[in-house]
Amino acid sequence: RAEYSLFDRQTGRPMCIGNGETCQRLTNQGVEHHPCPSPDLCPLAQGGACKPFGRLHVNLDESAELGSFIFRTTGFNSIRTLAARLAYYHAASGGLLSCLPLQLTLRGKSTTQSYRTPIYYVDLTLRDGTNLKDAISSAKQIDEQSKAAGFYQEALDHVARQGYGNASFEVGGEEG
């Protein structure tokens, strides 16, 4: 999930969170809904205070079955790369993204824009030693076994989306 966030630099609390279309802004009257024209066009965001903010919830093999690690980033390259990879793997696996053996990989690149200084971003790749054909075959088996045991990923995803939608500002105190 990626969106734009403007934080109060003194408290670390969110002041405005938007998706490029609409935003929720904290004012003296409470949380108000406004259009979100993106950081480049928003008068509140002048001076680079509003940044892209991405969160990727990842289930780790050794963690609790419903536990997750949350990768948070304000890096545009990481957000763009992760969004593209998630879409690719979701399409290639026929929607079995949660069953694929994936890993986060730190990559570096240098560009003319970065004056040849390396910039680092996170990529989503198949686990080392795994090819796409085998990963998809394994994902199908995992999905069938999970469903046979009564586990439905679609229902879990739906409930998670509902939970996100219920929060005025999703960023909790520990995330500020």
Regions of interest found by a model, annotated:
Residues 1-63, 115-119, 165-170:
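OB-fold ssDNA-binding interfaces and closely related basic DNA-contact patches used
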Residues 45-135:
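Extended serine/threonine-enriched, polar tracts that run as long, contiguous segments within proteins
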Residues 11-14, 78, 159:
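Residue-level detector of solvent-exposed, low-hydrophobicity positions
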Residues 3-6, 68-70, 75, 150-151, ...:
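Intrinsic disorder/low-structure terminal segments
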Residues 134-176:
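Eukaryotic intrinsically disordered, low-complexity regulatory regions
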